[in-house]
Design a protein with these regions (language model features):
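A short, solvent-exposed beta-edge/loop patch
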Residues: 116-160
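Acidic/proline-rich low-complexity IDRs
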Residues: 4-10, 47, 87, 158
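Secretory targeting signatures
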Residues: 1-28
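Generic detector of short, well-ordered, non-transmembrane alpha-helical segments enriched
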Residues: 17-22, 51, 57-58, 138
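Short, solvent-exposed recognition patches
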Residues: 33-131
Length: 160
């Protein structure tokens, strides 16, 4: 009887060890800087890094942490891609920065009909002005960056 109890305890200990080792490869930290889908968002002082693309956080802006999204399913023009998002706020002003990425990369970006070709911060892309918002999209390193702000100068500040 005693040998059977010891064997049962040993078997349970082995199962727990195997289960813990298997779970080590999974990320259970929802809202963390990285996740198992490959998404990443990091902030260090006034530098924001999303999917290894660097941005400047303009003076006075702070992250709205509840709006952070890491490796979520992309929608709209980038269906099938993942997206990591960071929202910066200063009073009533908001800057939304999204980086879309996919396993095979994103290679073709089509300019929307209502956009104009524009170079901001050294990046060639497309600027859309609609209902008081400015949206700038550009491709970099097989990813697509989208920045939405209430004015073009805020986009320029992010891309310095």
């Amino acid at each position: 009887m005693r040998k059977g109890l010891i064997a049962l305890i040993a078997l349970i200990a082995i199962c727990i060890t195997i289960g813990a080792a298997s779970a080590a490869d999974w990320s259970f930290n929802i809202g963390s800087d990285t996740n198992s889908d490959g998404g990443s968002v990091q902030i260090n002082n006034n530098e924001l890094k999303i999917q290894d693309e660097k941005f400047t956080i303009p003076d006075g802006y702070k992250e709205n942490e509840s709006a952070r999204d890491v490796g979520a399913d992309g929608k709209g023009n980038f269906e099938g891609a993942k997206v990591s998002v960071c929202e910066l706020k200063k009073g009533n002003e908001t800057i939304l920065i999204k980086v879309f990425f996919a396993d095979g990369g994103i290679h073709n970006i089509t300019a929307p009909a209502n956009s104009e070709n524009k170079t901001i911060g050294g990046h060639d892309g497309f600027l859309i002005t609609d209902d008081g918002l400015f949206t700038f999209d550009y491709g970099v390193n097989e990813k697509v960056v989208e920045i939405v702000a209430s004015n073009e100068s805020a986009i320029e500040a992010v891309l310095k």
